[in-house]
Regions:
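Conserved active-site and SAM-binding loop architecture
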Residues: 1-152
C-alpha cells in the first residue's frame, strides 16, 4: 500500500488517476488539501468532498497547515500535486510572469517544506504536474525556477 497525500487536489484528478490505474488498492489517499485563496466559495473542494468524502481532507490554506499544524499531515510514501500555474501560464506574457516569487508560484515552497520537515520520514516519491512554461518562466530567470525546484 502506497500512502499518498494529494496537494492542490482540485476536484481529485490525481486521485482518480491513481485509483483507476491501480484498481487493486495499491494507493491509499491518507490526506488531501484543496483551497482557493481569496474565494469564499470553495467549489473544487466541495466537489472533492462530494466524490471522496471529507475524511482526511483539508479545505484551508496549505501554507497555514504547513506552518502552524504540520503534525496533522500524516506520514506518506508519495506526495502528488498540481501546484498552481498562473505565474507560469501562457495566459500571461513572459515579461509579466512572476514565477516562483509570484502570488501562486510561491506555493511550490509548501511542497518543499513538507518534504523538508518530514526529514527521515519524507516521502520516497514525488509526482508533480504543471505547465511547460515552468521551464522558461519568468523571463528574468529563464529556467532558474525549475532548477531551484530540482535542487531542492
Amino acid at each position: 500500500m502506497i500512502k499518498t497525500i494529494e496537494l492542490f487536489a482540485g476536484v481529485g484528478g490525481f486521485r482518480v488517476g491513481l485509483e483507476k490505474e491501480s484498481n487493486k488498492g495499491q494507493f491509499s489517499i491518507v490526506w488531501s488539501n484543496q483551497w482557493e485563496p481569496g474565494s469564499k466559495v470553495q467549489s473544487a473542494s466541495d466537489i472533492y468532498v462530494k466524490n471522496f468524502g471529507d475524511e482526511n481532507h483539508s479545505c484551508e490554506d496549505v501554507t497555514e497547515v504547513v506552518n502552524k499544524r504540520f503534525k496533522t499531515i500524516p506520514d506518506h510514501d508519495l506526495l502528488v500535486g498540481g501546484f498552481p500555474c498562473q505565474d507560469y501560464s501562457v495566459a500571461r506574457s513572459l515579461k509579466k510572469a512572476s514565477g516562483i516569487k509570484g502570488k501562486k508560484g510561491v506555493l511550490w515552497w509548501s511542497i518543499y517544506n513538507i518534504i523538508r520537515k518530514k526529514r527521515s520520514k519524507a516521502p520516497r516519491y514525488l509526482m508533480l504536474e504543471n505547465v511547460d512554461r515552468l521551464l522558461k518562466s519568468p523571463t528574468s530567470q529563464r529556467g532558474k525556477d525549475f532548477a531551484i525546484m530540482l535542487a531542492s
